[in-house]
């Protein structure tokens, strides 16, 4: 499933990504990396990481082109995956993730929100006072939204859900029959 919340700004040259993480002493032929993903969902053209032996079974079958790992774990990776050795795997992954998804680290307020009275949900949802709804929001049937709540852009809420008062929802896919209590963020 593609990520509905954050925009991928790639592809990037592998050597440019390594410079970001100060791992440029390891150099590879010019190759474009499309995305950073977990071991299980990565494909050719992606970069992944292995930081714990607990994921060794997933590592053996990864389809990623590159993997950031350490000396201790690199033997679990398939021959088709080029190994990038790091002493600080998770920090390097954070730097690369920030490059691919720069808006994933911000906590900016969604300025696309508008009062629910001005949206398509005005007559479809029971709601309290002062409710703000962002763009591209989906809300199922039989839902309730409490006072002073904000549902930011690209949120999907299933059927028969209740959202309490003073709730802020961002970057979420909410299934059916979910109850979010007052004050949750």
Annotate each PLM feature.
Residues 1-118, 177, 183-184:
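Terminal amphipathic alpha-helical/low-complexity segments used for targeting or macromolecular assembly
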Residues 49, 113-185:
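Structural signal for interior beta-strand "rungs" in well-ordered beta-sheet cores
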């Amino acid at each position: 499933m593609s990520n509905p919340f954050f925009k991928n700004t790639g592809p990037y040259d592998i050597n440019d990504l390594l410079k970001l993480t100060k791992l440029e002493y390891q150099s590879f032929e010019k190759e474009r990396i499309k995305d950073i993903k977990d071991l299980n969902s990565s494909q050719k053209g992606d970069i992944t990481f292995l930081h714990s032996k607990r994921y060794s079974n997933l590592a053996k079958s990864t389809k990623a082109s590159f993997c950031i790992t350490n000396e201790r774990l690199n033997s679990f990776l398939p021959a088709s995956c080029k190994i990038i050795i790091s002493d600080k795997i998770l920090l390097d992954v954070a730097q690369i993730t920030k490059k691919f998804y720069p808006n994933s680290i911000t906590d900016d307020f969604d300025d696309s929100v508008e009062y629910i009275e001005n949206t398509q949900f005005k007559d479809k949802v029971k709601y309290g006072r002062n409710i703000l709804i962002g763009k591209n929001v989906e809300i199922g049937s039989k839902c309730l939204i409490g006072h002073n709540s904000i549902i930011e852009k690209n949120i999907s809420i299933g059927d028969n859900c209740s959202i309490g008062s003073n709730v802020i929802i961002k970057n979420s896919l909410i299934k059916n029959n979910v109850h979010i209590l007052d004050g949750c963020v």
